[in-house]
A protein has these predicted regions:
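Juxtamembrane intracellular "pre-TM" segments in multi-pass secondary transporters
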Residues: 1-11, 199-238
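Helix-loop boundary and gating motifs at the non-cytosolic
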Residues: 2-60, 237-242, 246-264, 271
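Intracellular juxtamembrane helix-capping segments at the cytosolic ends
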Residues: 35, 123-137, 360-374
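Helix-to-loop junctions at the C-terminal end of transmembrane segments
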Residues: 62-79, 285-301, 404-405
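Cytoplasmic membrane-interface "Motif A"-like loop-to-helix N-cap segments
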Residues: 72-89, 295-308, 410, 442, ...
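Symmetry-related core transmembrane helices of the 12-TM Major Facilitator Superfamily/SLC fold
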Residues: 87, 93, 175-193, 411-429, ...
């Protein structure tokens, strides 16, 4: 029996993209819910679990880098997007199945590395699916299709999280890996393989630059346009900071919640049911949040939603403090601690109430970024905003795990609830101006950004030399510096591409320094190296950030005339239009 090409009909296209997005949600639910729960049950500490969950989101923060390669390196026989979807889905299944024989928690580092590769393929698949949607969906189908795609992702997370936990009670945990891989491959077999893309016009390949050169040029173009758009207006620049900050308290949506669920005595079925209900509630309130924001104003409603996210966290924090449930409770002992029933009930109430507030927030936040996006580069700028949101999730999961072990649950939750409100200070400046055209302030913002990042990188040296004095707080500072290094790397990559008049040596140095800064994320695994290599790596880790800081301060002294040249004409035109009116 020949399966139908779902792309051939309107109903088929909607069905196809729903199921394709299911495969995007499965890995996230599997890691953040199912694996995190099982690791805590095996007495893996919250810090290790937080680092595991945080690393899982990193590929999504850099998914914009995959776009040029997916555009350029394509198979006309398999389909330009279909080929990438099929290949990445197969690789997702293969990488997951390769972990079946790993022993947890003994081989957690290797397990994390393999799942990081697994989720990289997931992020690549996301880019290919979105590109296919843009090319195949009719304009009147896009609204419903987007709703179905988000619903598919939510169901995928429930399948990979709650579904795996339900199943593990019958089969054990490791066999559920076959279920997850099989779910992905089922979509490959019944949806992706039968699809047929429209045949594109044949592309000449005899002359001209190589595909690698074309892809590199496209990536450079993306970086330059994103850099200029972020710095072009005050609203867009503030939006960059807003994207990097957590939008409200985050702990009840990350590993802290599953850690507590295990410690309070919930079995796998109960944890699965808790996460299933929270997913359903959050999905429903996403729609309501968007509707209310259109009616009562985005900034006003978003402020209420973000503030509301802290209330369940503070409620649960107070109950934990009241009952003396402060530090993580070891698991697997002969005499397990029995939690008061009031705390179990409080966890349910707080988690479901948090799902309401989080759903309302998600339904509104994206529209805020649309408000400050320059229409001329909308796809580039909005994609970059969405990618950076994943960086906030990654570092939040990491620091919270460290803090739980250092200062306990209540204080970690208090910090999270308060830190989640910081973004509210930026909301008044997240306001669109006429046309969102550049206002002439980009050079000034570029210099200020380079100076701040440069000083932060230089601060790494005294921190590293005296980190022992910080005690249990040192790992949290490590997380802060990781964010600084990633932000500095992105600035160097994009800024080096913009500064066309700068010496070529500077541009090359910026590129290589950016790559080395990104590589510093691997410093947590230096202990796995042999002693001579570990000593060399330790020296490199010590001196690279200050060297990057010096380079950034040098960039802060530049005039950034390239940005001024781009700004001048649109800004003048906007002012002239305003005067004419």
């Amino acid at each position: 029996m020949r399966l139908p090409n779902l792309l051939a009909t309107s109903r088929g296209r909607l069905t196809a993209f729903f199921f394709l997005y299911v495969t995007e949600g499965i890995p996230l639910g599997f890691a953040a819910i199912a694996v995190a729960t099982q690791l805590r049950r095996q007495d893996v500490g919250p810090a290790a679990i937080g680092a595991f969950v945080g690393s899982f989101y990193l590929p999504w923060a850099f998914k914009w880098a995959f776009g040029p390669f997916i555009d350029v390196f394509a198979s006309e026989r398999l389909g330009r997007r279909r080929g990438w979807i099929i290949v990445t889905q197969v690789l997702m299944a293969m990488t997951l199945l390769s972990t079946v024989l790993l022993k947890l928690p003994e081989q957690l580092a290797l397990f994390t590395a393999v799942l990081l590769v697994h989720n990289t393929f997931g992020a690549m698949q996301d880019v290919a699916i979105d590109a296919l949607a843009v090319n195949t969906l009719a304009e009147h189908e896009r609204g419903l299709a987007n709703g179905l795609m988000f619903a598919g992702a939510a169901i995928g997370q429930a399948l990979g999280g709650s579904g795996v936990l339900f199943l593990s009670g019958v089969t054990g945990f490791q066999p559920t890996f076959f279920f997850v891989a099989g779910s992905i491959l089922a979509v490959t077999l019944f949806v992706a393989l039968p699809m047929r893309e429209a045949t594109p016009t044949a592309r000449a390949r005899a002359e001209g630059p190589s595909r690698w050169q074309v892809a590199s040029a496209q990536m450079r173009h993306f970086a330059v346009e994103a850099f200029r758009s972020f710095l072009g207006t005050r609203g867009a620049f503030v939006g960059l900071a807003f994207a990097l900050l957590p939008s409200g308290a985050m702990c009840l949506g990350l590993a802290l919640q599953s850690n507590l669920a295990v410690e309070l005595g919930l079995d796998d079925d109960q944890v699965a049911l808790l996460n299933l209900w929270s997913s359903v509630i959050s999905a429903g309130f996403m729609v309501l949040g968007g509707y209310l924001s259109d009616r009562y104003g985005r900034r006003r409603t978003l402020a209420v939603y973000i503030a509301a996210m802290s209330l369940p966290v503070l409620y649960l924090m107070a109950l934990l403090q009241q009952y003396g449930w402060v530090m993580p409770v070891p698991q697997g002992g002969a005499n397990p601690v029995v939690a008061p029933s009031a705390l179990v009930l409080a966890l349910w109430i707080a988690t479901l109430a948090y799902a309401v507030a989080q759903g309302l927030m998600y339904g509104t936040r994206s529209a805020i970024f649309m408000d400050v996006t320059n229409p001329a580069v909308a796809a580039t700028q909005f994609t970059a905003y969405m990618a950076l949101l994943n960086l906030g999730i990654a570092y939040s999961a990491t620091w919270q795990g460290i803090a739980i072990e250092a200062i306990g649950y209540p204080k970690t939750m208090l910090i999270d609830a308060l830190f989640g409100l910081v973004c509210l200070l930026l909301l008044p400046w997240l306001r669109a101006v006429r046309g969102n055209v550049p206002d002439g302030g980009a050079p000034r913002r570029a210099r200020a950004s380079a100076a701040v990042l440069g000083l932060a990188c230089i601060a790494w040296l005294p921190y590293r030399l005296h980190s022992g004095a910080l005690g249990a707080a040192a790992p949290i500072f490590e997380t802060v510096f990781t964010v600084v290094f990633v932000a500095s790397a992105l600035f160097l990559l994009a800024g080096g591409a913009v500064l066309e008049r700068a010496p070529r040596a500077w541009v090359r140095a910026a590129t290589w320094m950016a790559l080395l800064l990104l590589a510093l994320y691997a410093r947590r695994w230096m202990d796995l190296l042999s002693p001579p290599l570990a000593d060399g790596a330790a020296l490199a880790v010590l001196v690279l950030p200050p060297a990057a800081g010096v380079l950034l301060l040098a960039l802060a002294a530049q005039g950034w005339r390239e940005l001024a040249a781009v700004d001048t004409q649109p800004a003048a035109a906007a002012r002239a239009g305003a005067v004419a009116q």
